[in-house]
Amino acid sequence: MRLEDYRSYYNVVLPIYHKIIIPQTRGEGWRIMEQLANDFRYNPLTWFVGNAVKTKDYYTHDEVIIYGEPGSGKTSYVIQSMLHVFEDVKEVRRRVIFDVEDLKRLLEDIRDGQRYEVVLFDDPSAVGLSSTWNMRSSAEKRRMLELFDAFVYVKDFISLVIFTVPRLIGVAKFFRDIATWRVQVKKDGKVIFTRREVASTRLGTLKEVDTPVMFYYIKDVRMPNEIWNEMMDKRKRITAEKIARFDSGDV
C-alpha cells in the first residue's frame, strides 16, 4: 500500500471505526461503513495480502481465520481481496486450496523451492486440516495426518495463511492458537476483525481475549466465474466419490 493510500485509509476509516466501537454511535458508524461497501481501498484484508506480497529481506508468517454462516460470502470476499492485489485470476487461483490435490501441488511447489506470499484454505476439512477427525476412516486419517505434519513445517514458507470456515471450531486447535486475526463475516455484510491479545483479570491472571479492532462492509461480493465453476466442480466430484464409497460399503 502506497503512502498516499495509508493517509487516505486512516483519514477516512479511523473516524468510522471510532463510531462503531462506541455503543452510542455504533449504528451511525455502520451506516457510514455501508457506503464504502466493496471499496477495497479501505479493506483491511487487502492491506494484509498486500503487505504479505511486499518484498522483504526476512521471513514473516501470519494466519487469519475468516468465519461465518454458509452463504455469507467468506470465500468470495477473500478471493476478491486477493484479486485486488494480484490483478490476475490465474495468480489468485494458484494460491487457493480447495482439495487434497491442491494441497499436494502446494507442498510440491514448496519442496521445489517456491515461496508463497498468500495461501487461502477454503474449508480446511477438505484437506484434513480441520478438527473433524472423527468424520474420517482410519486409513484416510493416517493419509491426511501425513499432509498435516508436512504443512506444520512448510507453513514457514508461506507469508500469510487464510482459512475460511463456517465456525471457528472447524479449524484445528493448532491453527486457532497461532492465528493473530479472527474475522467474522455476517450475512448482513458486516465484517469484524478481532485480534488475539493478552489481558489481565482482576485476580492478576492472564488470559487471551479477542478484541474488535477493524471493520469492513461487503455487499453482494462475487468471485470470478472461472474459480467459482472449478470450486463447484470439485465439490460435486468429492460428493460423488463419497456416495460411491458409501454404496460400495468401503467406509
Q: Each PLM stretch: what is its role?
A:
Residues 93-96, 167-176:
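Short, glycine/acidic-rich hinge or "gate" loops at secondary-structure transitions
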Residues 95-163:
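Conserved nucleotide-sensing/catalytic segment adjacent to the nucleotide-binding pocket
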Residues 188-251:
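Phosphate-binding and hydrolysis-coupling loops of NTP-dependent motor/remodeling domains
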Residues 59-87:
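Glycine-rich phosphate-binding P-loop
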